[in-house]
Amino acid sequence: MTRSLKKNPFVANHLLRKIEKLNTKAEKEIIITWSRASTIIPTMIGHTIAIHNGREHLPVYITDRMVGHKLGEFAPTINFRGHAKNDNKSRR
């Protein structure tokens, strides 16, 4: 179910403050965050945000095509290694 249009998109306050501070200074530096639920808004375009995936922070460069998506969509938490090639024990 999608978020109601009456509500604004969720962006963590600490993340929003960091981005606004960098926009006023016109600086570009990596912003580290644990907030995977924050929605990407147009003021984030051009910044690099390091998103936590449970183990490390993955740097993601924000482009205009990412607006409206959540930050967590761009930092996968599980690495699928593929199915077992020859698993005869589980067949028994």
Swiss-Prot record:
InterPro entries: Ribosomal_uS19 (IPR002222), Ribosomal_uS19_bac-type (IPR005732), Ribosomal_uS19_CS (IPR020934), Ribosomal_uS19_SF (IPR023575). It is found in: Plastid, Chloroplast. The keyword Plastid applies. Keywords: Chloroplast, Plastid, Ribonucleoprotein, Ribosomal protein, RNA-binding, rRNA-binding. One of its GO terms (cellular component) is chloroplast. GO terms for biological process: ribosomal small subunit assembly; translation. Protein S19 forms a complex with S13 that binds strongly to the 16S ribosomal RNA. Belongs to the universal ribosomal protein uS19 family. This is Small ribosomal subunit protein uS19c.
